[in-house]
Structure formats: C-alpha cells, structure tokens
C-alpha cells in the first residue's frame, strides 16, 4: 500500500529523482516490512451455548452490553419453559464476556406466560428487562443482572415493545425510552375488522424507577404500526423507526411493508410526523402463510437499525432488511447521513450468493470505532432451505463496502427436532369459554423469532445472540466477534513450548444425549482455561484411563465404554480428540475462556447401565518464560 502511494507520488519527477526515490522507497519498505498492519479482517470466537434449561424451544432474542463493564452481558429470550409447556420470557446473564451464563426467571412470566423480551443497560450500568406477560412489565437490576426488582407494570394491552437508553452526553443523558404498539382507545377491531393501531412511548428520567406515558408517537390509517429498534443520536435526538403493515383481514393482496420514522428532539415529549424510509416487498399474506407451512426456515422479518454513536461516521443511521426476490430473500442495506432526510439506494450485502439461497433474519450494530457489523441466517449450501448457517460481515467505511462474509456457526442448524415441534398451550377465558390455543416454537417462529439480537460492547467486540438448531431444538448461542482494522496491529505471538495443560484446563460439558437403541452417549466437550496464563493451540485430549485406579485395586466390576469417533481411530485408552479448530479464528485461549464443543461419541457397555469413568491428559502450548 505504501509502495503504491510512493509510485503515484513520484510520477512527475526527473529520472534521477525517481531513481533516488525508488531506492529510498525500497529501503523504507524493507525496514517497515516487519511493522505492516493487516488488512481489516473478521475474527470469530468459539460458539458458546447460553441456554442449558432443557430440550425446549427458545425464540426471539435480545442482548445488551453494560457500558461500564463490557464483560457484563444481558440476554433475553422467549422460552417454552412453563410447567404446562407454554412460553415465558427469561433473562441470561454473563460476567465474563459471554463464556459462561446464568439464567433468570421472573414470577409473572412463569405464572402468566410471556413474549417479546427486551433488554438494556442504563448509563451507569443498571440492567433493564422488559417482557409482555400479564402486562408490559419492567424490571431493574443494580448488580448487573444477578438480582431484580419487583415488576413495574406500565400497560395491560400492548405488543412488540422496544427499549433504548440515552448513552450520550446530550441534554437527556441517561433517559430510558420504551415504545409499545397498542390499539387506539375505543377501537373495535374484532367487530369491525378496521385496524386502528398506534405507537406510544414511555420515558424515565430516574434510571427506570418510574415512567411518564404513554405518549402517542404516531398512528396507522387502517394499518398496523410497530416500532423497530430505537436509536439515540449523539445530541440526544431520539430516532423511532416504525413498520407500517397492511390490515391482512381485509387486504390480503397487499405485498409491501412501509418503513417510516419519527424524531424527538425534546427527550420523548413531542414527535415529528412520520417520514418514509423505504417500501419493503414481502409477497403478501398468502405467500407468508404458505412459506410458514412449507418446511422452509427462511421467513420475512422487519427492518433493523443501528447508528454510529460517535465514531468516524457519527450519527450515520443504517437500515437493513430482506427484500423478497423470486421467492428468495436478499439482504440489503441503506444508510442516511442527514438524520433520515435522505437514504442511500439499498444495495445487497452479499451479492455473490447463489440464486437458490436466502438471507434472512438480520441484525446490525455499530461499535465505538464506527465499524458496522451485520449478521444473518444464511441458507447458502442448502437449496431446500430447511437448514441454515450463521453469517457475519462488517463495513469499516460507513456501509460503502463490506468484508467477505465469515461463517460464525460451527455446526449447521436443522431445527425440526421434537423440542421445536412440541406444542405448548396458551390458556385463557374467552366468550364464556375456557380456551387453550396451542403453538410450538417451530410453527410460530420457524426462523427462530420475529427478531434476533446483537450488541457491540465498549471494547469493540460484537456479540450476536441467536437461536441455533444444531440439536434440532432452538437453543441460544453466542460468539465474540472482533473486526481487526488497520489501526489495530496484530500482537506478535510469544515464543511457545509444548506442555501438559491438565493442571490448567478443565472439561465443560454441554447437555449430554443418549440413544438407548444404539447405546450411544453423545458428549459435547469444551476445554476451559482455569489458569491465569494464556494457552495456545493446537490442543489435544488423550484418553489415559477408562477405569478408576481404585476400582481396579478393589477388583470392582466396572462398565467400560467403547470410543467411536476418536481422531486417531482408537476405541479405548490412547484415543485422542483433536481441538485444533475449537477456537474458530482465535489464536489463544485466555484465562476463563472456553473452546467450542467437540463431540465425543461413546458406546455404553450396557443399554441400561450408563455409568463410566474417563481420565484424560490435555496438551497444548504455553509461552516460554520471559517470552510474554
């Protein structure tokens, strides 16, 4: 790059000068060769299983990072977890950057059921959780999500709420905003089929302890109107994107949605009239219903938004959505540099995708360096579109160009397992009857929900938070993704030496499965660094014993399993498992971090006796003393 610059610079000078400059340039480049910084690149970390609460469907995810501690992450999801199999919202909390998680249940959710989870953090680190249950309930936590306040019920009849906090230094810093889709007072949609919907806003100036509202933002004209993810610009201006959708009951031929927005410059007191962003073709309600029952996973979802909070493209607003094109979904992006007054022509993010493939369910975020991250569900490689991978790309130039997409998921999602298809009831009293409406995770949310989450922490790391179907049932996964740019030179790796890591690494198991007919035990095994040292791959696990020494000395009868999938083909002691790819793109395993899960397949000695013992040695590399 520097050499090309010199060639262009010297084009107008004399031959003698060109020779001197050429000699200087070669000397300079030779001297600087060791200091070159890499081109922008995406670095994907291991896939981390977040949910460990059973073979039950998880749908509609959200995630936020604490602005005062980027390792404190808060996620939310609908989970088919109630005692009768119905849905409730749960929170998931991490204090180590997403390596380990703890789940949180809320009493109202477990009693009444719920949906549409929202999460966020206040400007001083207070955690917020919102869910629709017996009302729109707001919860606070002043310890990062460990303990929570009692519910503050803000409304009784709402839908599709959205949450944002002003993290700027503007006049409304710290203000919490919460929108809700609700009926216009006095409307009788069930009787007249005339849709009268509006978006309202609640605001809090005391860290979520109390709210003012609802205040009407906008209303539809016999259409639905739902707020999308809210944004706050650098001066505190509130940007409220909304999706205007047809009244499907009387307009079954309508085939486009309209994305619009309103602004508030006075902290959520008054709002501008809605202005147009784009029209989004979705094919019509008949096409949507047909797609939902087709066995395909690609489905339509609303547009998503992000803003550069203060990087090199300050206040640039980004919008991404899927266009329906010849029965395939194509992910496009548009941006505005003038607070929504004008928008760039939408352009595809992955123009080289095969004609058969769909890109759907996107989410976007911008980190403090101004890097725009985008991830989505991708059916490339699967013409039947009944499974998907997770893809990610990024732009370092304000959405003008994008890096080659990276695969995030370490396994393919094929989400048609029994946990996704098992229906759960919604029980209510209606028209003098006790009714039970049944829905399964897959039938209601074949694409894992109406939306998915991603956040970017103050450390610049992106954290996608997705519903993953590798087990057949939608479970929650995340990964830490870094976008290395020219301003972030790679740190040279220290000189390393091979070592046993068995005193530095432990085994962490994802949920274990067992098939009685085949007697196969499936063990998803991760390595966790429990030392204070950085450890380096490649890592290898070697099975050293399948009988505990005490049992051997005591002549106890033991059940010894057979190993079915060792890397070296051995079926007993001496079998090895290769973890060289378990870090994904990472070059080291930091303290408290975990690898991706590698599946160990064992065959139990008996169909009904599945107790056994394993002793293993783990090897890898450590930095030579004095080399770090």
Predicted region positions:
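Asparagine-centered strand-capping/turn motif at beta-strand->loop junctions
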Residues: 526-533, 545
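Terminal connector regions
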Residues: 596-628
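Bacterial N-terminal signal peptides
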Residues: 17-30
């Amino acid at each position: 790059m520097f050499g090309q610059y010199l060639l262009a610079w010297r084009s107008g000078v004399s031959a003698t000068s060109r020779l001197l400059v050429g000699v200087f340039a070669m000397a300079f480049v030779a001297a600087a060769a060791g200091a070159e910084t890499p081109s922008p690149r995406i670095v994907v970390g291991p896939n981390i299983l977040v949910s460990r609460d059973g073979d039950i469907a998880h749908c509609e995810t959200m995630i936020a990072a604490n602005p005062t501690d980027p390792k404190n992450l808060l996620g939310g999801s609908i989970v088919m977890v109630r005692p009768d199999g119905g849905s409730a919202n749960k929170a998931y909390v991490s204090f180590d950057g997403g390596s380990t998680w703890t789940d949180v249940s809320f009493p109202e959710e477990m009693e009444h059921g719920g949906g549409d989870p929202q999460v966020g953090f206040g400007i001083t680190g207070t955690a917020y959780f919102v869910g629709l249950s017996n009302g729109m309930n707001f919860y606070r936590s002043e310890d990062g999500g460990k303990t929570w306040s009692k519910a503050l019920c803000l409304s009784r009849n709402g839908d599709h709420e959205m949450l944002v906090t002003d993290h700027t230094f503007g006049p409304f810093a710290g203000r919490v905003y919460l929108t809700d889709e609700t009926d216009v007072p006095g409307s009788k949609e069930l009787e007249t089929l005339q849709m009268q919907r509006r978006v309202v806003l609640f605001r809090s100036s005391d860290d979520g302890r109390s709210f003012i509202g609802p205040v009407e933002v906008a209303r539809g004209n016999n259409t639905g109107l739902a707020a999308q993810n809210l944004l706050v610009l650098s001066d505190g201006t509130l940007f409220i994107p909304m999706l205007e959708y047809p009244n499907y009951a009387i307009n079954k031929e309508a085939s486009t949605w309209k994305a619009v927005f309103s602004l508030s410059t006075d902290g959520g007191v008054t709002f501008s009239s809605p202005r147009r962003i784009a029209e989004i073709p979705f094919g019509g309600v008949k096409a949507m219903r047909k797609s939902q029952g087709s066995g395909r996973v690609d489905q339509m979802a609303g547009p998503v938004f992000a803003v550069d909070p203060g990087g090199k493209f300050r206040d640039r607003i980004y919008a991404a959505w899927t266009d329906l094109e010849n029965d395939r979904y194509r992910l496009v992006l548009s941006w505005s540099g003038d607070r929504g007054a004008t928008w760039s022509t939408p352009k595809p993010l992955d123009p080289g995708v095969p004609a058969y493939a769909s890109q759907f369910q996107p989410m976007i975020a911008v980190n403090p360096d101004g890097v725009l991250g985008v991830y989505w569900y991708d059916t490339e490689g699967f013409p039947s579109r009944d499974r998907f991978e997770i893809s990610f790309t990024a732009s370092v130039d304000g959405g003008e160009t994008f890096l080659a997409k990276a695969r995030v998921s370490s396994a393919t999602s094929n989400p048609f397992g029994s946990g996704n298809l098992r229906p759960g009831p919604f029980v209510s009293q209606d028209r003098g009857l006790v009714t039970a409406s049944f829905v399964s995770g897959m039938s209601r949310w074949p694409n894992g929900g109406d939306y998915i989450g991603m956040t970017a922490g103050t450390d610049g790391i992106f954290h996608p938070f997705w519903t993953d179907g590798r087990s057949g049932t939608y479970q929650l996964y995340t990964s830490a993704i870094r976008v290395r740019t020219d301003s972030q030179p790679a740190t040279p790796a220290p000189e390393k030496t091979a070592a046993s890591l068995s005193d530095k690494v432990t085994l962490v198991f994802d949920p274990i499965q067992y098939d009685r007919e085949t007697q196969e035990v499936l063990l998803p095994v991760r390595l966790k660094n429990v030392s204070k040292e950085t450890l380096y791959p490649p890592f290898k696990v070697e099975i050293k014993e399948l009988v505990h020494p005490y049992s051997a000395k005591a002549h106890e009868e033991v059940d010894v399993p057979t190993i079915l999938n060792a890397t070296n083909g051995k079926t007993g002691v001496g079998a090895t498992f290769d973890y060289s790819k378990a870090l994904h793109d990472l070059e080291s395993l930091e303290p408290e971090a975990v690898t991706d899960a590698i599946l160990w397949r064992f065959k139990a000695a008996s169909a009904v006796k599945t107790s056994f013992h394993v002793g293993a040695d783990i090897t890898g590399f450590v930095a030579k003393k004095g080399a770090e």
